[in-house]
Regions:
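Glycine-rich phosphate-binding loop of ATP-grasp-fold ATP-dependent ligases
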Residues: 17-22
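Single conserved hydrophobic/aromatic residue that forms the stacking wall/gate
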Residues: 1-13
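PLP-dependent aminotransferase class I/II
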Residues: 25-196
Length: 196
């Protein structure tokens, strides 16, 4: 318990220093702040209320500006990994790699669709990668329209959003970042190609 609470402050107060801090009187309030700063998520798939991406500090922003000096190399490395994935995964039955009409793509993500012809469903493939300590993401899962704060809206009815729910059940994003070791990229490809 912070000694300043005895001064009759409100429910929370902030401290101003590099990165800042929010001080709360109890674990429940802290937990709510943690949810709010992380898009409302309590775990990988559960959202309890609307939130924001409130995780960037000034130091992170400064590092981001420094990284802009190397953006061409970063994008080239991402594109190289994306090309490798595409080259080796387009022939795997039941895996669909997205294509883009853009002449140049930043390769910020590499989503694939796990289709009916593949021996595993998306969640089983995700679990397989997790067991191998390879971080993949089930992006757009669960759909935002399934969150409690939106699910009662008429526009959130799953019957009216077949593409949303289909994509949410099939998309998995593969790791793609500068410095990703080639052997990990190869393991990702081998894992997908040899799954049964």
């Amino acid at each position: 318990r912070d000694p300043l609470w005895s001064r009759g402050l409100g429910d929370v107060y902030k401290r101003q220093f590099e990165g800042g801090a929010i001080v709360s009187p109890d674990a429940e309030t802290k937990q709510r702040i943690d949810h709010l700063k992380n898009f409302g998520f309590v775990d990988e798939t559960t959202v309890v209320e609307p939130g924001i991406n409130g995780k960037m500090s000034e130091i992170n922003a400064a590092f981001g500006l420094l990284q802009l000096k190397h953006i061409d190399e970063v994008l080239a490395e991402r594109r190289r990994i994306a090309a490798f994935y595409r080259q080796h995964l387009t022939q795997v039955c039941g895996i669909t790699c997205l294509t883009s009409s853009a002449k140049r793509h930043n390769a910020s993500y590499f989503p694939i669709f796990v289709e009916a012809g593949y021996p595993l469903d998306r969640d089983a493939l995700y679990a397989l990668f997790k067991r191998k300590n390879i971080h993949t993401r089930r992006y757009f899962y669960p759909p935002i329209t399934s969150f409690p704060m939106y699910s009662a809206l008429q526009s959130a009815c799953p019957a009216g959003l077949p593409n949303t729910y289909s994509a949410a059940d099939r998309v998995i994003c593969l790791p793609i970042y500068p410095g990703l070791p080639d052997e990990v990229v190869q393991t990702v490809v081998d894992t997908i190609a040899n799954a049964s």
